[in-house]
């Protein structure tokens, strides 16, 4: 009626005004269906006018033009304004910090979880949400509305195990003891089949994020590239990459640095070590002079390992541990340049020398790590809720995935995109496996 009254001229303001003038409200699911309903009505209006033209030539050109123009403007519907004006649950949601400070995708996760929970319990959305917000207080609302279920994980491992055992038993009956050579390939094939099936059955929920403008700047983040330094042109490329990362992720709460080691050798120090350290320090000083005091250098001394070789202690793992200790007032590396206050660093983002950090990639990780639902909760020294480490999805570039046969096997050819969206452990169990590249909460 609103569209007919306005001559099929559509706008968010006229729609809200029509509903509020009649004292009508909408449920969450009805708001999501609103765009499709309006689209259907406008298409029917165009069809009616075309039918009138065909029958007696008395169709309204103005109404048809208005309906077509409204169809073109339909994507401009401000869904958040509609929610705020017409949906009673939005007022309750805005009292929850994780929802109020979240981005649009995060708000959709909350709303869709409420829709499913209300349908499952057969309760009114407002009554259910009001009770849930009182129960959670300042805690995790989403954990109450949509608690993580371990049923998909149980079904996955049960079905894959039964299928693998059945195939192995059949192979043993057919080929006897020779089938033992096929046990590992069979299990790998079954797990791959299980990943393929469950990636289409189990819905992957996007991580909850804060809006970028809601990120607290008092908790700073240090982005470091862990690498070996050799001097010369090889090191120049690493510092150029560090500069690119800064330009792609310029933010007042981000700091950048190099976490380096010297190459392995049989002596604690080589003649060229001082030149390598001096070259690295000059690069850091140049970046600080050009972009402000936002760059640091952490270059460790060699230590002797059990094999009698001198090198960085425990390589990358040891480098990260030593850096966290230094950030918290511990022993500093041999070559140390840090013009900013290290005590303000709350997060450490570790990257490899061959890792790409996309535009605003660090900010996206931070927005997920700082969301109230994702903040880690400790019990007896272990994280029992939330996350202490955030690891971004690893995407293999198509050019790299087909460069060698080994890379083709590792990227699984056509699975380049699926592997970035579905993860067996994270999707089914709610936790992942850290591979060394990610955001670490160093305050734990």
Spell out what each predicted region is:
Residues 1-155, 207-444:
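Internal catalytic domains of large membrane-associated glycosyltransferases
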Residues 191-197, 230, 260:
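Conserved catalytic alpha/beta cores of large enzymes that bind or transform nucleotide phosphates
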Residues 193-209:
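Transmembrane-cytosolic junction motif
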